[in-house]
């Protein structure tokens, strides 16, 4: 059990991407859905622009001050109370940034747990993230290899 007014936050990020995240569904014992409460300080982005291959995501703006960069690439205000869905694939690309003067909060709800399996594409930096319970790895997409590279056929 957890409470949105007193969740266990983890501090994440680097300059420009500082954020606090509480994985409230996980803290409450959920195993197949992800719900996180995010707190984004002024001038910081919650995360890089990205889209998911497996998980669909919904964001609920709890405060004013957030701006959304969607799949079209343009920034727009995300007013308090707005609920927006991000489908899987490039059309679900998104990034949230706090352009306000005070900390802004939002909820994210995903079709998979926050520590679940997903593949995430980061087009701005050319990375691909592979995530599961045991794997949290990011790779540059430019280093893709041929399907058969390194494979040896069985010998009799």
Predicted regions and their residues:
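A short beta-loop-beta micro-motif enriched in histidine and acidic residues
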Residues: 25-33, 44-58, 72-74
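Short, conserved beta-strand element in jelly-roll/cupin
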Residues: 37-41, 52-68, 109-113
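Ligand-binding loop in jelly-roll beta-barrel domains
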Residues: 88-117
């Amino acid at each position: 059990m957890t409470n949105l007014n007193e969740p266990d936050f983890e501090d994440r990020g680097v300059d420009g991407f500082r954020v606090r995240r509480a994985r409230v569904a996980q803290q409450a014992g959920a195993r197949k859905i992800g719900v996180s409460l995010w707190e984004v300080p002024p001038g910081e982005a919650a995360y890089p622009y990205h889209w998911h291959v497996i998980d669909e995501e919904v964001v609920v703006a709890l405060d004013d001050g957030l701006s959304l960069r969607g799949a079209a690439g343009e920034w727009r205000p995300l007013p308090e109370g707005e609920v927006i869905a991000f489908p899987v694939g490039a059309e679900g690309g998104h990034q949230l940034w706090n352009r306000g003067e005070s900390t802004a909060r939002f909820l994210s709800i995903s079709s998979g747990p926050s520590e679940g399996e997903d593949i995430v594409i980061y087009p701005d930096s050319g990375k691909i993230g592979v995530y599961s319970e045991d794997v949290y790895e990011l790779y540059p997409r430019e280093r893709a290899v041929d399907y058969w590279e390194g494979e040896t056929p069985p010998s009799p």
